């Protein structure tokens, strides 16, 4: 599957950063490649269902880290929204040993997404001296987990005290669930504050907006992927927003997957795209608050789709927006935008940004 993850996605200039298929116009080649990638993901899901059983499909997403090992018989699932880590196995022999190994590796994995293939069962997770989950999880004694000895002891405790099993009619599934600390979201956000501040100064984009976008897109999951092949913390698509940013910076081609999986590069690219939306594509909107609402919505659904809410003529659309109050612009975008996802997106990001502004 790995060789298909870099499928070329050719899209219009004004397409969004994280959208699945929305844009100003449809390019036939882009549609074909997007459909091809979607088909491949469907096949991957079908294979997982054949192995694990009906309604047991779990696949990596923007806010879900999912890694399969042991010929797809063991998986680690971190739900960054709920703050839970679930390790499961259907191994018929020594299931506890499979769980123990997966628990230790998950607790001690690093934060280099480019080194891990989430669509294969290759055991490519390396134990890090600075685990990504350090501080986001504590053991049964309330201590954070950095070293293999503590992780091993915690794994033994979990297997003795929290091991569960269930049958789905096809398999017996053994599992252990670990709850992350209550402020796990803030712990992850803190890792990237320096990068956010640097990008904010470089492009003139408010730190609170960058953080709100990151929270909404990925819950600060650097391993974030999507069925539209959006990558990393700010869910940047290589061949749309990534290509636009590279072009604006005088670079040819598109950013690589490894580039976008690097947190600093991802934040820089996502922030550069926000600046392009604000200063170029939606620069005709005078009121900064109205323009911010438009930029947020456009990051998800494309600048063209935002303007078409007001008029099919882009210049006229900006003129109409300039006659409206920011409150009316917000109300219009959250009720009249054709995409329900984009309508919800503006609400989520705006709410998150308010919380970061209060800090």
Curated annotation (Swiss-Prot):
The gene is mltC. Residues 1-16 form the signal peptide. One of its GO terms (biological process) is cell wall macromolecule catabolic process. It comes from Escherichia coli (strain K12). A lipid is attached at residue 17 (N-palmitoyl cysteine). It is an enzyme of class 4 (lyase). This is Membrane-bound lytic murein transglycosylase C. Belongs to the transglycosylase Slt family. Induction: By SoxS. HAMAP family: MltC (MF_01616). A lipid is attached at residue 17 (S-diacylglycerol cysteine). NCBIfam families: PRK11671.1 (NF008670). InterPro entries: Lysozyme-like_dom_sf (IPR023346), Murein_transglycosylaseC (IPR023664), Murein_transglycosylaseC_N (IPR024570), Transglyc_AS (IPR000189), Transglycosylase_SLT_dom_1 (IPR008258). Keywords: Cell outer membrane, Cell wall biogenesis/degradation, Lipoprotein, Lyase, Membrane, Palmitate, Signal. Transmembrane segments: none annotated. One of its GO terms (cellular component) is outer membrane-bounded periplasmic space. It holds the Pfam family SLT.
